[in-house]
């Protein structure tokens, strides 16, 4: 009917959909010419990423079958107050468990998600809250670093009206307490989700539906690669196609052309026509140059005359003898060798 708008169902919060949203956000940030232009598009993209992460977080911790709680708050009554509460981390009971990484998440995304959902500020404080242990020891005892002398804890603060602040603080405490309960190895769904988010941020996430890991890696690399928008390519004329008949060798037509082209197009006789007419028996091999510069095989040593003058220092040329040997080790004695005694 006229006037009715079609409402499409929102996509389900899946890791693949979250990866697509993150890739779109990276693409928009990589285009300097479009940064700050599509403000509404960027806002909608951030809201969709927040919604998908929130739904995935709720499904991970609370289960997909549980009813979602309403985040509606009453109207504020009274002045703005600040409330805070400390939740100590059970590091003594579980010394090998990484509570700090579980609470903060990859690049602080889990803590940011809790802050956006509860409206409270969540910070990890106390001994062991800093990643750099040397820097922690240096800051211990300095002003504004007094919390390093306390045990590891989570500090939750909220600023709002009294009635609203109490509701927000209660929700935040419930959510943080869920993170302080360690799960068995292999059954920690929150850890799996955090690793998946880290893979999406690093560009190494692979879809479980793809059977070929090489194809999944190529898709992830293509998604992470920056795409450059270019103008339309100029239309070039089509290249000339090859003739269907094979072309002949290039040497023989050239020789035939030289042989047959006795008259040039302007009517003057070809310069090689006289040479060819003088020596028709030469055939295809002819030389327009003088004889000393022609290509000839190397002269055999047997063609040189034998020097018999007996000049001192002259090299005696050996004469090739064509006598056949009956036995390979038999020595042939000829008349000249018999005369000289050799």
From Swiss-Prot:
Question: Which controlled-vocabulary keywords does the entry list?
Answer: Cytoplasm, Developmental protein, Differentiation, mRNA processing, mRNA splicing, mRNA transport, Nucleus, RNA-binding, Translation regulation, Transport
Q: Known Pfam families for this protein?
A: KH-I_KHDC4-BBP, Quaking_NLS, STAR_dimer
Single GO biological process annotation from the record? cell differentiation
Say what the protein does. RNA reader protein, which recognizes and binds specific RNAs, thereby regulating RNA metabolic processes, such as pre-mRNA splicing, circular RNA (circRNA) formation, mRNA export, mRNA stability and/or translation. Involved in various cellular processes, such as mRNA storage into stress granules, apoptosis, interferon response, glial cell fate and development. Binds to the 5'-NACUAAY-N(1,20)-UAAY-3' RNA core sequence. Acts as a mRNA modification reader that specifically recognizes and binds mRNA transcripts modified by internal N(7)-methylguanine (m7G).
What InterPro entries is this protein classified in? BBP-like (IPR045071), KH_1_KHDC4/BBP-like (IPR055256), KH_dom (IPR004087), KH_dom_type_1_sf (IPR036612), Quaking_NLS (IPR032367), STAR_dimer (IPR032377)
UniProt keyword Oxidoreductase, yes or no = no
Coiled-coil region: none
Q: What is this protein called?
A: KH domain-containing RNA-binding protein qki.L
Keyword match Nucleus: yes
Sequence ranges assigned to domain KH in this UniProt record: 88-154
Family from the record: Belongs to the quaking family.
Assembly and interaction partners: Homodimer; does not require RNA to homodimerize.
List the record's Gene Ontology CC terms alphabetically: cytoplasm; nucleus
Naturally occurring in which organism (per UniProt): Xenopus laevis (African clawed frog)
According to its UniProt record, where is this protein mainly located? nucleus
The molecular function terms of the Gene Ontology recorded here are: mRNA binding
Residue window of motif Nuclear localization signal: 325-331
- What are the subcellular locations of this protein? Nucleus; Cytoplasm
What gene codes for this chain?
qki.L
């Amino acid at each position: 009917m006229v006037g009715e708008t079609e409402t499409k169902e929102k996509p389900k919060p899946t890791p693949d959909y979250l990866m697509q949203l993150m890739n779109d956000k990276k693409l928009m940030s990589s285009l300097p010419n479009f940064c700050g232009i599509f403000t509404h598009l960027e806002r909608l993209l951030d809201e969709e990423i927040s919604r998908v992460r929130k739904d995935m977080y709720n499904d991970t911790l609370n289960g997909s079958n549980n009813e979602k709680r309403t985040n509606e708050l009453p109207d504020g009554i009274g002045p703005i107050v600040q409330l805070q509460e400390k939740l100590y981390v059970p590091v003594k009971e579980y010394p090998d468990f990484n509570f700090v990484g579980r609470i903060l998440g990859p690049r602080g995304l889990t803590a940011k998600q809790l802050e956006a959902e509860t409206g409270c500020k969540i910070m990890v404080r106390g001994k062991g809250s800093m990643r750099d242990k040397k820097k922690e020891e240096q800051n211990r005892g300095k002003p504004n670093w007094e919390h390093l002398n306390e045990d590891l804890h989570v500090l939750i603060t909220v600023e709002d009206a009294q009635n609203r602040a109490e509701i927000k603080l209660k929700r935040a405490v419930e959510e943080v307490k869920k993170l302080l309960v360690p799960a068995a190895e292999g059954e920690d769904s929150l850890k799996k989700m955090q690793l998946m988010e880290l893979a999406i941020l690093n560009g190494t996430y692979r879809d479980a539906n793809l059977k070929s890991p090489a194809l999944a890696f190529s898709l992830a690399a293509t998604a992470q690669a920056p795409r450059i928008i270019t103008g339309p390519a100029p239309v070039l004329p089509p290249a000339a196609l090859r003739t269907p008949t094979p072309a002949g060798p290039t040497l023989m037509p050239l020789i035939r052309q030289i042989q047959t082209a006795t008259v040039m197009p302007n009517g003057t006789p070809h310069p090689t026509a006289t040479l060819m007419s003088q020596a028709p028996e030469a055939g295809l091999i002819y030389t327009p140059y003088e004889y000393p510069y022609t290509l000839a095989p190397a002269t055999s040593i047997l063609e040189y005359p034998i020097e018999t003058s007996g000049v001192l220092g002259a090299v005696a040329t050996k004469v090739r003898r064509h006598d056949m040997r009956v036995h390979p080790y038999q020595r042939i004695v000829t008349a000249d060798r018999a005369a000289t005694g050799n």
